[in-house]
Amino acid sequence: MAELLNVKPTRMELLNLKRRITLAKKGHKLLKDKQDALVMEFFTIYDEALRLREELNEKMMEAFKALQRAEIDVGTLRMKEISLSVKPNREVEVKTRNVMGVPVPLIEAESFKRSAGERGYAFVSSSARVDLAAEKFEEVLDLAVRLAEVEETLKRLAKEIEVTKRRVNALEYIIIPRMEATVKFIKQRLDEMERENFFRLKRVKALIEARSGS
């Protein structure tokens, strides 16, 4: 049997508990609906994260292969010089948006893709393979930023799902059962009190009648 609430067995408390149970059940349904919607949203974004992760792995393999070819083409020393002369790329701004009421990151950034001139290294000392390697790594950066946003969103959704699940379970297995058990107890106690009063009145009536008869 569920633990009882510490309340007085009165009709006022009985009515109050019944109202609280109605509200708790409505709250439970709303939270359960929210939990189900969060889980659906989580798996939708999870599928996107898997796709992005797979695409990122492929792009990284392509980028490192392109880098190896570029290094063979211009030499290791020249490759280091080129990498040190590259200008800083785009700035990344992290904002917030809401997904099912959960604040999640929104990363705003222009594409990292640039022309050879924008990168800052001298075109004459470079090569087409160096440009291709740079382009491939810029594609990697674009995907990495998107994946970071998606994976952080998943973490926050997972946390909210866990919090919502605990609330649903608390209502379903602890709070509502306690209130229902207390309602049952109060009803039983009120019935007992009513029967006791009934028998007490009968005894009083019998005593009065006995005295009247004598």
From Swiss-Prot:
Task performed by this protein: Component of the A-type ATP synthase that produces ATP from ADP in the presence of a proton gradient across the membrane.
Subunit text: Has multiple subunits with at least A(3), B(3), C, D, E, F, H, I and proteolipid K(x).
Cross-referenced InterPro entries: V_ATPase_D
Origin: domain of life: Archaea
Alphabetical GO biological process terms: proton motive force-driven plasma membrane ATP synthesis
A GO molecular-function annotation: proton-transporting ATPase activity, rotational mechanism
Keywords (A to Z) from UniProt: ATP synthesis, Cell membrane, Hydrogen ion transport, Ion transport, Membrane, Transport
One annotated Gene Ontology cellular component of this protein: proton-transporting V-type ATPase complex
Zinc-finger recorded as keyword: no
Gene3D superfamilies with a match to the protein in the record: 1.10.287.3240
Name of this protein: A-type ATP synthase subunit D
Membrane topology category: Peripheral membrane protein
Subcellular location: Cell membrane
Family statement: Belongs to the V-ATPase D subunit family.
